[in-house]
Curated annotation (Swiss-Prot):
Keywords: Cytoplasm, Lipid biosynthesis, Lipid metabolism, Phospholipid biosynthesis, Phospholipid metabolism, Transferase
Stored Pfam families: FA_synthesis
Source organism superkingdom: Bacteria
Function: Catalyzes the reversible formation of acyl-phosphate (acyl-PO(4)) from acyl-[acyl-carrier-protein] (acyl-ACP). This enzyme utilizes acyl-ACP as fatty acyl donor, but not acyl-CoA.
HAMAP family reported for this sequence: PlsX
This protein's name: Phosphate acyltransferase
GO molecular function: phosphate:acyl-[acyl carrier protein] acyltransferase activity
Amino acid sequence: MKIVVDGMGGDYSPHIVVKGCIEAIKEYNNIDIIITGPEKLINDELQKYEYNKEKITVLDAKDVITNNEHPVMAIRRKKESSIYKALQMMKNKEADAVISAGSTGAFLAGATLVVGRIKGVSRPALAPIMPGKNGPFMIIDCGANAECKPSNLVQFAKMGEIYFENILNVKNPTVGLINIGSEEEKGNELTKEAHKLLKDMDFNFVGNVEPRDIPTGNTNVLVCDGFVGNTVLKMYEGVASTIFETLKDEIMSSFRTKIGGLLLKPVFKKFKKDYDYKEYGGAAFLGVDGICIKAHGSSDDKAFKNAIKQAINFYENGIIDKIKSHIEQKMI
């Protein structure tokens, strides 16, 4: 399996990207990695490590797309950028998966324009796996489509169900619609119409899910438009960060609380690990005709290694072909 990684994507590129790739090839011997970016800069980073040099190659890309640029215009103009060249390899069947921690807008726009959608998919959707109290869950869409039709949400649900069932090995995962109330008649026109369609599909549909119930993880696949999904995602990350920081401040506030914190250290350590996004790698961009994983902008080497693991699972489980099969059978 060949995986192409955007070497200039993320807050700590290229050194963290390179480190994550090297850790991945040491753990997974069935992959080869191509890193896109300024050749000298990437090679200088690679020289800091001992590794099998046959497993990692560099594709020179002199340009970088930043978060401040207009995504579509940047993709169209900067064809020497690390993101564009990575996606072009996928388009040309020179790679089996693409991973980037760079500009989300540019990556999603590029995946849609360069790689292209699966025939029959109206809108690709971003689908991160999130940590929950009773197990991980997925939110789809998380920012690719701010405005949607009810039929889009039905496709999101099916693609999410296929991915969740195969990647997390959960048979017949539950599917819920994020809404302001659990009652069927609650919500706006989008959610009301989507609810009608979803309950008639072959999903394990559990109905509307209120935001307060999202963190439980009781519902496996949570469906919404990209505006709602991105808002929930960022709030979730912010709340988790605030809780950790507040606990840390309180524990360090006195000698007595420091002793208590020391006794509870194993509990806090497990809690932090369970709610660490690095454990889940990145968000799959479902609906494009190739494996595209969007890693978090602040990903460290562990997160990159796990994003690569995620791409391997995606490939080995044949998710793209399974989505295509459902579409051909007019099941979504």
